[in-house]
């Protein structure tokens, strides 16, 4: 598992909860705006998680059924929305209500061992014991995001958003 995927999942789930309350979000009725371009940093990863949870897709998404394109998901995901402050915006197509969501993963620092382990692990120079320890501290951070801080408003920051 991955801290970026874990944080993305929390951002989308909590953003949808802010928009829908106890109602069930409707796939294909949600626009997703990404602040950055698709190839910037982890934007593509975050957008992939948002697509899985909301159905919103870029130009490659489902084009809909029949001449009216019912259930269309295509073009509901946009990149490079410079007008937003958060990492992403979730917008209901039925009501126009929208929230911008930001992840502050810095409140959950990596284990101190990670500073020495990460370069070795990604370059292929880590020993088997170092690789095992790398996996352990990596997963500790994922657990902290998904379990210990799942409801932490400092981790997932949600604010109302308007395009005006």
Predicted regions and their residues:
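Non-transmembrane, aqueous-exposed alpha-helical and coiled segments at domain scale
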Residues: 1, 8-164
